[in-house]
Amino acid sequence: MTNQQDYTQDNDKLYRYLFQNRAVRGEWVRLNKTFTDTLNTHHYPKAVQDLLGEMMVATNLLTATLKFDGNITVQIQGDGPLRLALVNGNDQQQIRALARVDGNITENMSLHNMIGKGVLVITIAPKEGERYQGVISLDKPTITECLEDYFVRSEQLHTQLIIRTGEYEGKPVAAGMLLQIMPDGSGTPEDFEHLTTLAATVKDEELFGLPAEELLYRLYHEETVNLYPAQDVQFFCGCSAERSSSALLLISDEEIDEILAEHKGSIDMQCECCGTHYFFNKEAIEKLKSTKL
């Protein structure tokens, strides 16, 4: 077993790698503090925590495939007790997530029972250029399987996703791997099938507890794998007092006055992602109102 100092060197890291003789590329990511920071200010049911972890890993792996600066939003909306699950990540591997629950969700509740009638929406937003949005049917047992199907349909590329969530040494962890045949057409289905068969043997404790290099060696010790430098992954909400102020400016003066009257002369705005509170008293509100003039 790898000791703690060894495995933690790759906590909250994303690696890209390439099989030299197979024309197949891969990615690996593990979320430790990033996942904990996401959950810290919320009391999500266990099934929702696991789903968010799965979606976060998927989003990290998806953003690593971008050939441009931008971000990807992976969002589930439904009419079940889980009304919304949303993850947003960018090409810098900054990620945030939130969920809205309205009803009882048991620990082992299935994806379909949590969501009810719903869809999975992926929005790709380049910093320059047009946004792209894909709507995916939730007709598979897991988000991972739905996303694999999305890759096949949208990019027509053989793709394997392996994503696991759980605990390691008493702390929440989510990790995953992506394998994809190269889009230049040089890879063969046989090569891809060979590598995915090996990847499918990975154990949870290996994904959660091994450094990337050792994990890849265990899975592919007979292959030549080029492992590229890691990219740091971190929770990043992006909220600020300025953004909260801008949101207040969209509300009519009459409605703001009603809110102030109901809440003893101050407005408390709380970020859904990180839980930060932004307080605005009457003086601050009047100053904001003056900027509308």
Which sequence ranges carry the predicted segments?
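Cys/His-clustered metal-coordination modules, chiefly Zn-binding fingers
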Residues: 199-293
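Interaction interfaces in information-processing and related assembly proteins
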Residues: 2-229
